[in-house]
Amino acid sequence: MDEEKRLVFGLVSRLLDYPGKDLVDSAADIEQWAGKIPGGSRESLLDFLSYLRKTPLIDLQEEYTRTFDHNPGLCLNITFHKWGEDKKRGTALAELTKTYNEAGYEMNCKELPDYLPMILEFISVCPEETGFPLQEEYGEQFALMGSRLRAIQSPYAKLFEVLI
């Protein structure tokens, strides 16, 4: 994976996490990093960052909760979109944990290992031979979520444009 794609995945990881004051405060720094990315990815990220900077924090939090927490079709636990509650999902979660551990990656949040921001952060820092299979494994789910977000005209759709 080239450095540009790593940067994109790292930025999207940060922007897909629950919005707090620290995210809003760091928007200008994130915007500088996004400005270094060529092409359409830059424009999509800058469009989302414009929304982030113009929207009051409480409204950002309400939109995030309404979009990802109250809508099962958009939950950020990516294996749910592939397997639902099937036992294969449990196997996938165990495999993700194993992948993280073998790569020396510390899961530093209280989410399940399939939490999309965590997967994206991992892909942005891990060796290509480890991250590329995850992109391949869940690329269809990234596209599906992007399509669903576009259908409801969510500002978060811009972030999924750069993942596929």
Where are the regions that the model predicts?
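Charged, alpha-helix-forming regions
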Residues: 1-115, 121-164
